Amino acid sequence: MEKRKTIKVTLVKSLIGTRHSHRLVIKGMGLRRLNHTVSLCDHPSIRGMINKTAYLLKVEE
């Protein structure tokens, strides 16, 4: 069975003053607080979420 590629995403900037839609995207990725890291599968929809909120995140492949 092949291993799926994962991406580690960390929230590095506060959500204060950001657009409501960006806050919902961050919540949808499972990020809750500053410096919280989650591992997500490398999928086009996840990539789109990362691109939309890239200014708030640190991404490791």
Curated annotation (Swiss-Prot):
Which HAMAP family does the entry link to?
Ribosomal_uL30_B
What Pfam family does this protein match (any one)? Ribosomal_L30
| Organism (species) | Nitrosomonas europaea (strain ATCC 19718 / CIP 103999 / KCTC 2705 / NBRC 14298)
Q: Does the keyword Ribosomal protein apply?
A: yes
Query: Coiled-coil regions in this chain?
Result: none
Q: Which family does it belong to?
A: Belongs to the universal ribosomal protein uL30 family.
Q: Name one GO biological process term.
A: translation
Q: What is its quaternary makeup?
A: Part of the 50S ribosomal subunit.
Key words of the record: Ribonucleoprotein, Ribosomal protein
Q: Which SUPFAM superfamilies match?
A: Ribosomal protein L30p/L7e
* One Gene Ontology term, aspect cellular component: cytosolic large ribosomal subunit
Return the protein name: Large ribosomal subunit protein uL30
